[in-house]
Every structure is written in structure tokens, then in C-alpha cells.
A protein has these predicted regions:
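Active-site-adjacent structural elements that line small-molecule/cofactor binding pockets in enzymes
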Residues: 1-284
Length: 284
């Protein structure tokens, strides 16, 4: 049976302090599988790790995760400790979706080069995996160097699930080679089976089992019986977040009346997804 996850994507000016905890509690009460959030620097979203820590404290069951975290913006030793702590206080409920970053201003803000961000993120993730499971880690890489480093706490989960996504061939290969899950963007959900077969080939080439890789999709939702108002809310969110309109986003999102949205959710899940992550574009 497929899972539904809900993503808290409100920018700070459009939310209130109580919303985060209330959102998490409602997710758990509704039987939702997971709660997710975004990760940016040069944008007025709430910090992803702190937001998820608040959600963890307000819940007992739901998984909490990022879709997606930008690991290349942080040193892997500090990020590994932060994520391990989040996994510890949530009693092993963390999933980390990682991305490589498409907005240069996020990198400029923390004085990290935009070029090489994909390789930097991959090296960060690989080093974090070692820091979560090994003592006295020594690593000499292109971007990071550590010497005899041991950090704590250890995560509750023996292996924190790491998801990645993308549509370029290199991104599909990364997902198939080392990720625990693949996140498909909304525009690619209608043809997910085609994309997944490409990922599965890389999974098999790496000596792994495609059935052990979780298949997730990310989309956005705006519900209103007045379709025009729902579409207005969706477009407003997209422009605010991406800085521009992105084609016919409504064609690959969940927009309209509750009945229309429910029908679209079923259609998306029929593409073979294990988890559908839904970002709520309407701040209400």
C-alpha cells in the first residue's frame, strides 16, 4: 500500500509559531505516513532541522524528512551530528532527501562555490555515512578533510535512509548507485515508470536490489472548490519559491476541489510510487 507524506513548505511570513507543531500533530492524527520540509538559505523558510526537531517532539509515529536538504551548504561533520541528533530525539524516524542546489544565491550566502556542488554534496553524504557508523574516521577528499574524527551520538537507525532525485542521467545514476530512495519531481510523475526503469538499471549494475529502493514522488497541492482560486494559490507559491512561473505547473500538481484532488492522488499513486509527498501550496 502506498504512503502519503505531507510537506510543510510555508515561508515564515505566512505562518505562525504554533503552525509547525499543529501541522505535525494533525499529520499523526490523520494517519499520514510522514512529514517533510524544504531546505534553503536565501529564502524565508524555517530551518529544516529545527522545524523537524519540533515536529519530532510533538509526535510519536510519523517519519520526518527533508525533500530536499542541501548537504553541500554545510560541513559534513556538523551536519552528520545534527542529523544523528535528530534521529536520536525522534527515536529513529528520520529520512533525508538530498539535493544539489539549483539556486546560486543559497551558495553565495554561505561563501561556498556554486560550481562543483554535485560532487561536493556526494562527498558530504559519503563522509556522513562513515561518521555515523565508524570511529576515528580519516578522510582526504576534494572538498573535505578530517583526521581521526569520531562524533556522537550514533543514529538510532543503523542506516539513516538517504533519498535523492533529479532527471539528468548523472542524477539517475547517483540514485541507483548509493541512495536508499529516489524522489521524482511532479513534472516527471506521469512518466515515472520510464524514469524508474533507468534508475533500476543503475541499481542492478551496482549489485543492489531495486525492490529495496523506495520510490517517492513530490508534488504540490491547493484545494478549493473554486478551481481558479486553487490555481491562484498554487501559482503564487511557485513564483514565491522558485522566483518564476514554471510552465504549466497545474498539469502536474493537485489542484481544485477535494474530489478532484483525491482522484488525481489515486492517478499519481498508480504510477508505481511507494510514497507521494504533497507540499501544501496554500498557507492556510
Amino acid at each position: 500500500m502506498a504512503n502519503i507524506g505531507l510537506a510543510f513548505v510555508n515561508p515564515a511570513p505566512l505562518t505562525k509559531p504554533a503552525y509547525v507543531v499543529n501541522f505535525a500533530k494533525k499529520c499523526e492524527a490523520m494517519g499520514v505516513h510522514s512529514m517533510w520540509t524544504i531546505d534553503r538559505v536565501a529564502y524565508d523558510n524555517l530551518d529544516s532541522m529545527i522545524l523537524l526537531a519540533a515536529a519530532a517532539g510533538a509526535t510519536q509515529r510519523i517519519r520526518i524528512g527533508t525533500s530536499v536538504l542541501l548537504p553541500g551548504l554545510r560541513h559534513p561533520a556538523l551536519l552528520a551530528k545534527t542529523i544523528a541528533t535528530l534521529d536520536f530525539v525522534s527515536n529513529g524516524r528520520v529520512t533525508i532527501g538530498v539535493g544539489f542546489g539549483s539556486r546560486e544565491n543559497d551558495f553565495t550566502a554561505v561563501e561556498i562555490p556554486f560550481d562543483g556542488r554535485g560532487s561536493r554534496a556526494v562527498e558530504c553524504v559519503q563522509l556522513m555515512k562513515r561518521l555515523w557508523s565508524e570511529d576515528n574516521v580519516t578522510h582526504k577528499g576534494r572538498f573535505y578533510n578530517v583526521q581521526n574524527l569520531t562524533i556522537g551520538p550514533r543514529p538510532i537507525q543503523k542506516q539513516i535512509p538517504i533519498f535523492t532525485g533529479g532527471s539528468a542521467e548523472a542524477a539517475l545514476k547517483r540514485a541507483g548507485t548509493w541512495a536508499n530512495g529516489f524522489i521524482c519531481g511532479s513534472s516527471a510523475i506521469p512518466e515515472f515508470s520510464v524514469t524508474w526503469e533507468k534508475v533500476a538499471r543503475y541499481v542492478r549494475a551496482a549489485g543492489r536490489n531495486p525492490n529495496e529502493i523506495e520510490k517517492a514522488g513530490l508534488t504540490f497541492m491547493a484545494i478549493n472548490d473554486d478551481h481558479a482560486k486553487a490555481l491562484e494559490a498554487l501559482n503564487a507559491y511557485v513564483v514565491r519559491y522558485y522566483g518564476r512561473q514554471r510552465g504549466d505547473v497545474a498539469a502536474t500538481s493537485l489542484v481544485g476541489s477535494p474530489a478532484a484532488v483525491a482522484e488525481r492522488i489515486e492517478a499519481f499513486l498508480s504510477r508505481g510510487l511507494d510514497t507521494l509527498i504533497i507540499g501544501l501550496a496554500d498557507p492556510d
